[in-house]
From Swiss-Prot:
Species classification: Bacteria, Pseudomonadati, Chlorobiota, Chlorobiia, Chlorobiales
Pfam families: HGTP_anticodon (PF03129), ProRS-C_1 (PF09180), tRNA-synt_2b (PF00587)
Domain-related comment: Consists of three domains: the N-terminal catalytic domain, the anticodon-binding domain and the C-terminal extension.
Cited InterPro entries: aa-tRNA-synt_IIb, aa-tRNA-synth_II, aa-tRNA-synth_II/BPL/LPL, Anticodon-bd, Anticodon-bd_dom_sf, Pro-tRNA-ligase_IIa, Pro-tRNA-ligase_IIa_arc-type, Pro-tRNA_ligase_II_C
Substrates-to-products reaction catalysed: tRNA(Pro) + L-proline + ATP = L-prolyl-tRNA(Pro) + AMP + diphosphate
Alphabetically ordered keywords of this record: Aminoacyl-tRNA synthetase, ATP-binding, Cytoplasm, Ligase, Nucleotide-binding, Protein biosynthesis
The EC number(s) this enzyme carries: 6.1.1.15
GO molecular function, one term: ATP binding
Gene3D superfamilies given in the database record: Anticodon-binding domain, Bira Bifunctional Protein, Domain 2, C-terminal domain of ProRS
Protein name as catalogued: Proline--tRNA ligase
Name of the encoding gene: proS
One example of a Gene Ontology biological process annotation: prolyl-tRNA aminoacylation
Keyword DNA-binding among UniProt keywords: no
Subunit comment: Homodimer.
GO CC, alphabetical: aminoacyl-tRNA synthetase multienzyme complex; cytoplasm
């Protein structure tokens, strides 16, 4: 019930944990650092999977599956890559009661094991491009965990593509980060900033990393998706060469890209409130709950509720009826608000007599009377569309209200405690590290979206916010999850 949830104002971190557990999205496991994704949480992941998988396939990608165990010799082939992941790796040393001749790493990501296969599959330009996605679990040994946001094992998708030219690879990188943006904004109703990571924040082993960054309700940033241009690094590590159209040998150009169950954490923190989960309808496996008020002629009310549910379901609006008599209508209202059901329909004997029902929105708690006629389905559909748009608009306005353009170091330090800060940066790793050390803020994204760049005059030369040296552009700083 919602009364178990700490308010956001009182303790945002505890609010998040309370909500995840009370809404039955996930729970802690007896395995340290791991979580159990409960049916309510997994239903959201299934909706995310279905939407993303469709978008991947529309752009020519296919699914495959590769082993979760990676030989140590494979990992060692890409030095920068393993250096980035070494502290997070889980290693298998024994199997079948014996010590293994070669250690096996439980995949923290799959570049190395996949490129060992690509080397066998690619001989000529005719074998390219390869556009493969994998839905899998990965393991990264986390010391400080938080449900959905940071766990030792998590679910994700990882795309791995191979190309004949650097131009094709770069096109793929941009295509995929734009797919993530579309998914975040159109399905999650979560506005994101698209751009590049700084050199120190990019993926280990990549030439460049592109990302989408979202603002949570506490003003912190959350990296919601990444797309990496791997250049020829992995192809060289695995000696993956192909014969070009000109008949010469060249190394393959590569990309990788992925999102994870971390998106569920982002979804929660972008929209939810002190009463519980708030879900955009497109990611709600159950969009409408009908609660009959069982007084007087119960059978007639029940029958009408089930008829309405059947009609809505037939029109593609997932609807269910809670006509149990174990709990009061008030208890049910609070419970389904906690679970984030976007629309609630209340139907009692008096409503039936008057040919109407009460419809309540989860996002605004606004109640409307609707006639029980042929227009009911259309009206419910319109309300669901309005909720989807309102959640996006609300989140975008929140980001606008909590984004500051800082021109002094004092202003920067004060503002970064509350949200995003746009400021000049001199482009050096030293200044970036100093800012992180003093404020815990990092460069979240160097925006590439032209509209965003113009909105904040990102290309305007100026003075670095920390070093005072000349700076060619502004970047987005924030504290992050």
């Amino acid at each position: 019930m919602a009364d178990k949830i700490t308010s956001r104002q009182e303790d945002y971190s505890q609010w998040y944990i309370d909500l995840v557990r009370s809404a039955k999205l996930a729970d802690y496991s007896d395995v340290r650092g791991c979580m159990v994704i409960r049916p309510n949480g997994y239903a959201i992941w299934e909706k995310m999977q279905a939407a993303l998988d469709g978008m991947f396939k529309q752009t020519g990608h296919v699914n495959a599956y590769f082993p979760m165990f990676i030989p140590e010799s494979f990992i060692a082939k890409e030095a920068e890559h393993i250096e980035g992941f070494a502290p997070e790796c889980a290693v298998v040393t024994h199997g079948g009661g014996e010590e293994l001749a070669e250690k096996l790493y439980v995949r923290p990501t799959s570049e190395t094991i996949i490129w060992s296969s690509y080397k066998k599959w690619i001989q000529s330009y005719r074998d390219l491009p390869i556009l493969i996605n994998q839905w899998a679990n990965v393991v990264r040994w986390e010391m400080r965990t938080r449900l959905f946001l940071r766990t030792t094992e998590f679910l994700w998708q990882e795309g791995h593509t191979a190309h004949a030219t650097p131009e094709e690879a770069q096109e793929e990188v941009i295509r995929m980060i734009n797919i993530y943006r579309t998914f975040a904004e159109e399905y999650m109703a979560m506005p994101v900033i698209v751009g590049k990571k700084s050199e120190s924040e990019k993926f280990a082993g990549a030439d460049a990393t592109y990302c989408i960054e979202a603002m949570m309700q506490d003003g912190k940033a959350l990296q919601a998706g990444t797309s990496h241009n791997l250049g020829q690094n992995f192809a060289k590590a695995f000696d993956c060469q192909f014969q070009t159209k000109d008949g010469v040998l060249d190394y393959v150009w590569a990309t990788s890209w992925g999102v994870s169950t971390r998106l569920i954490g982002a979804l929660i923190m972008a929209h939810s409130d002190d009463k519980g989960l708030v879900l955009p309808p497109k990611l709600a496996s159950r969009q409408v709950v009908i609660i009959p008020i069982l007084k007087g002629n119960k059978d007639e009310v029940r029958a009408r509720a089930r008829f309405i549910a059947k009609t809505l379901n037939r029109h593609g609006i997932p609807t269910f009826v809670d006509d149990s008599e174990n709990n009061s209508p008030g208890w049910k209202f609070a419970e389904y608000e906690l679970q984030g059901i976007p629309v609630r329909i209340e139907l009692g004997p008096r409503d039936l007599e008057q040919g109407k029902c009460i419809v309540a929105r989860r996002d605004t708690f606004e109640k409307t009377e609707l006639l029980l006629d042929d227009e009911l389905t259309i009206n419910i559909e319109e309300i669901l569309n309005n909720i989807q748009q309102n959640l996006y608009d609300r989140a975008l306005q929140f980001r606008l209200d909590n984004t500051v353009e800082a021109t002094t170091w004092e202003e920067f330090k004060a503002s970064v405690e509350k949200g995003f800060v746009i400021a000049h940066w001199d482009g050096t790793h030293e200044t970036e590290a100093l800012i992180k050390e003093e404020t815990k803020a990092t460069i979240r994204v160097i925006p590439t979206d032209e509209e965003y760049r113009q909105q904040y005059n990102m290309d305007e030369p100026g003075t670095c916010i920390r070093s005072g040296k000349p700076a060619a552009q502004k970047v987005v700083f924030a504290k992050a999850y």
